C-alpha cells in the first residue's frame, strides 16, 4: 500500500513543478528531467522515496504532514490493518496515503527543499504522537536543488519491502502507467550499473483516439488483458458528468475457456489518476460482460 501511495505523491510533486514551470521558466533549468527514485538499503533496513518535484517548505510540512500528531491517525491505522476490504476502500483514499507508511515503519524522516527557495527542512516522526521540523544547512542531503526524500525505517516484520524484485513487482502492478519515470536502486549494487525505468509510463487510454495506431491498441490489449490474439472490437471513449471517467475496453476474438463458468470474475482493471486500484470489482460491469478486457480510469472516483 505505502509504496503505491508514496510513488503517487512523488509523481504529483513532479506534476506540480511542471505546471509551475509554465509561469516560472527557470524553475526546472538546473534539473529538467523529472523522475522518482526508490533506493533500498538492506544494511540499514531503510527504503527511500526520492523525487525532484516541487518540494516543500516549513509551512507545507506543517499543513501536509502535521496531522500525524492527531489522535485520529492511530485509529485510522488500526482500522486499515484490520480491514478485510482494504483493496477497495481505505487504500483508495490517497489523501491519507503517507500515513500508511507507519504500518511498516518505526520511524520516518522527510528531507525537502521547495523549488525556488534556499532553505532545506527535515521532518521526523515515530508515528506515535509527536513530530519535529528542523532547518538544515547541508543542501547536499538532496540530489537535486529541490524536491523531497522520504526515508522509511522498515520493521523486522516487513523486510519484504527491502527486496528490489518485490518493490519492482509492486511498481509494475500499481504504478506502471504513471507518466513520471520510476527507478528502483539497490544500494548493494555497483554504482556504475545503469538503472532503467521500471514503469512503462504510457497510459494509452489518456491519449486521443486518432493518435493511437491499431498496432498500439493491440499491444496494449495483449499486455493488459494477458491475451495473445487480436481484439475483435475496441471501445475507447471518455464519459463526462458528475464523475468523469475514461474507458478502453476490448472484446477478445477468441472465446475464453471458462466463459460460461458462473464463478468467473470480470477482468477489467480499475484505475484512479492512472494508478491501479483493483481488478476485482464485481459491480464495475454486469456479470454477462465479464469476458471484456481493458481499463476504466477516473480522475475523481469516490473510493
Show where each model-derived region lies:
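GHKL (Bergerat-fold) ATPase N-terminal catalytic module, capturing the glycine-rich phosphate-binding loop
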Residues: 1-156, 160-161, 169
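GHKL/Bergerat-fold ATPase module in large chromosome/replication-associated machines
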Residues: 90, 111-136, 155-158, 165-303
Amino acid at each position: 500500500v505505502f509504496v503505491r501511495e508514496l510513488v503517487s505523491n512523488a509523481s504529483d510533486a513532479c506534476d506540480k513543478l511542471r505546471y509551475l514551470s509554465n509561469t516560472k521558466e527557470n524553475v526546472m533549468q538546473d534539473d529538467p528531467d523529472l523522475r522518482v527514485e526508490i533506493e533500498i538499503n538492506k544494511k540499514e533496513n531503510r527504503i527511500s522515496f526520492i523525487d525532484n518535484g516541487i518540494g516543500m517548505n516549513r509551512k507545507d510540512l506543517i499543513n501536509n504532514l502535521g496531522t500525524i500528531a492527531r489522535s485520529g491517525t492511530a485509529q485510522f491505522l488500526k482500522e486499515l490493518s484490520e480491514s478485510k476490504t482494504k483493496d477497495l476502500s481505505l487504500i483508495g483514499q490517497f489523501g491519507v496515503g503517507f500515513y500508511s507508511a507507519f504500518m511498516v515503519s518505526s520511524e520516518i524522516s522527510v528531507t525537502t527543499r521547495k523549488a525556488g527557495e534556499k532553505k532545506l527542512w527535515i521532518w521526523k516522526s515515530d508515528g506515535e504522537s509527536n513530530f519535529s521540523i528542523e532547518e538544515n544547512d547541508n543542501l547536499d542531503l538532496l540530489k537535486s536543488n529541490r524536491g523531497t526524500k522520504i526515508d522509511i525505517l522498515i520493521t523486522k516484520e516487513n523486510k519484504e519491502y527491502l527486496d528490489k524484485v518485490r518493490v519492482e513487482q509492486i511498481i509494475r502492478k500499481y504504478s506502471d502507467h504513471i507518466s513520471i519515470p520510476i527507478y528502483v536502486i539497490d544500494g548493494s549494487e555497483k554504482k556504475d550499473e545503469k538503472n532503467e525505468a521500471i514503469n512503462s509510463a504510457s497510459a494509452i487510454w489518456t491519449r486521443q483516439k486518432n493518435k493511437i495506431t491499431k498496432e498500439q491498441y493491440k499491444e496494449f490489449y495483449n499486455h493488459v488483458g494477458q491475451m495473445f490474439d487480436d481484439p475483435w472490437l475496441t471501445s475507447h471513449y471518455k464519459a463526462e458528468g458528475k464523475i468523469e471517467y475514461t474507458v478502453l475496453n476490448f472484446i477478445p476474438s477468441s472465446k475464453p475457456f471458462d466463459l460460461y463458468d458462473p464463478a468467473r470474475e470480470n477482468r477489467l482493471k480499475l484505475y484512479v489518476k492512472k494508478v491501479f486500484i483493483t481488478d476485482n470489482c464485481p459491480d464495475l460491469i454486469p456479470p454477462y460482460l465479464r469476458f471484456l478486457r481493458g481499463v476504466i480510469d477516473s480522475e475523481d472516483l469516490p473510493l
